Regions:
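N-terminal small/polar loop signature for handling phosphorylated ligands or for N-terminal nucleophile
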Residues: 31-91
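Gly/Ser-rich phosphate-binding catalytic loop and adjacent alpha/beta segment
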Residues: 1-33, 37-50
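Short glycine/serine/threonine-rich phosphate/pyrophosphate-binding segments
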Residues: 20-24, 87-91, 164, 187
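Phosphate-binding and adjacent anionic-ligand microenvironments
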Residues: 73, 77-79, 100-102, 120-315
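Gly/Ser/Thr-rich active-site loops/lids in small-molecule metabolic enzymes
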Residues: 36-40, 100-118, 200-204
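Domain-scale recognition of functional cores that engage charged ligands
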Residues: 1, 12, 18-27, 69, ...
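Short Gly/Thr/Asp-enriched flexible loops that form oxyanion-binding sites at enzyme active sites
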Residues: 88-106, 143
Length: 319
C-alpha cells in the first residue's frame, strides 16, 4: 500500500543487523520503500563475527533486541526490527496495548504477513483463484485457518526454505505464490528469491505497520484483530539438549519409544491423529491408517489433540 507508506513515511523505525550483513542493504531498502525515519543501533552497525554486544545474535531472543528496544524507548519509535547475521531472518518488537515493548514471534509474524497480503489482494481485486501459500509442518495451524477462510490453497512442507522453494517450482507458470514462512522467523513474500530473506521481510513488516497505523491501529492491535477473527493460538518450544554420542543414542531411543508407545493423551486432551513422517503414515483415534503426501520421509512425529493442539517431536543434531 504505497499510499499508506507515503502518509506514514515519518514513522520511527529502529533497525539492527546485530553486527551482520543486513547493515549493507536493509536500511537502504527501507528508505527506498518510502520510510524516511529509520534509526540504527550504532554499536551494532559494526561488522564483527564475535558479536560483542550480544550473548547470541539470534533475533528470536529478547536479549539480541535489547539495545534496539532501548533506543526505540529513547526516541519513541513504533517498530523494532533485527536481522540475523546472514540477513535471512528477522525478529520484531512493538508496543502492546499497555505501551510496553513486546516481541512478536515467528508464527505471529507469518500470520500478519499473510493477513496483510490477502487483505491487499482482495482490496485490489487481484484474487484469481489460483493463489497458494506455504508453511512448514511445525508452523501454527492458524495460518492454514486464515488461508482456508479466504479460499487460498495452503500447502504444508518440511522445515527449511528449500522445501518452500520446491512447492513454488512445482507450480511455476500454473499458480500464483503469495507467501510462505516458518515459525523460526523466516518469510518469503515473492518468488523471485527462493530462500528466506530479511531484506524484503523488513520492508513488508514496516509496510504492514504503516497500513495498520493508517487504519488507526498499532501492529499489536492488528495481531489482536487476527486472533478475534480467526481464533487464538499460542506456541512454545521445548529444547532438550543431549550432546555427544550417548546423546545421539538417547535421542534415537526417545524417538523409537514414541513410535512404539504413542501417547493417547497430551495435556489432558485425547490424541485424535498421529503423523509419522518417517513412515509417511497417519493414524486416527479409531486406528485408521492413511498415507501422508510428502516428497520423502523425515524423522518427525506429530500429535493432534481433541482441543486443537498440535505437538511436534523433531530431533535436530544434539536437540
Amino acid at each position: 500500500d504505497p499510499a499508506a507508506i507515503a502518509r506514514h513515511k515519518d514513522m520511527k523505525i529502529v533497525y539492527t543487523p546485530i553486527h551482520g550483513t543486513g547493515m549493507m542493504l536493509i536500511p537502504r531498502a527501507l528508505k527506498m520503500w518510502g520510510f524516511e525515519n529509520v534509526f540504527t543501533v550504532p554499536e551494532q552497525m559494526v561488522k564483527d563475527g564475535n558479536f560483542p554486544t550480544v550473548v547470541s545474535p539470534n533475533p528470536e531472543n529478547a536479549e539480541a533486541l535489547s539495545m534496539a528496544v532501548n533506543l526505540a524507548k529513547e526516541i519513541d519509535a513504533e517498530l523494532v526490527m533485527a536481522s540475523d547475521p546472514d540477513a535471512d531472518r528477522v525478529g520484531i518488537a512493538c508496543k502492546d496495548d499497555k505501551g510496553e515493548w513486546v516481541l512478536i514471534n515467528g508464527n505471529q509474524t507469518c500470520m500478519m504477513y499473510l493477513y496483510y497480503i490477502l487483505t491487499q489482494y482482495k482490496q485490489l481485486g487481484k484474487i484469481k483463484g489460483n493463489e497458494f501459500c506455504v508453511k512448514t509442518i511445525v508452523t501454527t495451524e492458524l495460518i492454514k485457518k486464515i488461508a482456508d477462510k479466504n479460499n487460498i490453497e495452503m500447502l504444508d512442507c518440511y522445515t527449511g526454505f528449500k522445501w518452500i522453494a520446491r512447492e513454488i517450482r512445482l507450480r511455476e507458470g500454473k499458480k500464483k505464490y503469495i507467501g510462505g514462512g516458518e515459525e523460526s522467523y523466516g518469510f518469503l513474500a515473492e518468488d523471485f528469491v527462493r530462500d528466506k530473506d530479511a531484506v524484503s521481510a523488513c520492508c513488508l513488516i514496516a509496510e504492514v505497520a504503516a497500513w495498520a497505523k493508517d487504519n488507526g491501529k498499532s501492529l499489536y492491535q492488528l495481531l489482536l484483530d487476527i486472533y478475534v477473527e480467526y481464533g487464538f493460538s499460542k506456541e512454545f518450544t521445548v529444547n532438550v539438549v543431549k550432546p555427544g554420542k550417548s546423546g545421539a543414542e538417547e535421542i534415537k531411543a526417545m524417538m523409537e519409544n514414541f513410535r512404539a508407545n504413542p501417547p493417547k493423551e497430551l495435556g489432558g486432551s485425547k490424541v485424535i491423529l498421529s503423523k509419522d513422517y518417517k513412515t509417511l503414515k497417519q493414524t486416527d483415534d479409531k486406528g485408521n491408517v492413511t498415507a501422508i503426501d510428502m516428497p520423502e520421509p523425515s524423522n518427525v512425529l506429530q500429535y493432534f489433540t481433541e482441543d486443537g493442539s498440535k505437538v511436534s517431536v523433531r530431533p535436530s543434531g544434539t536437540e
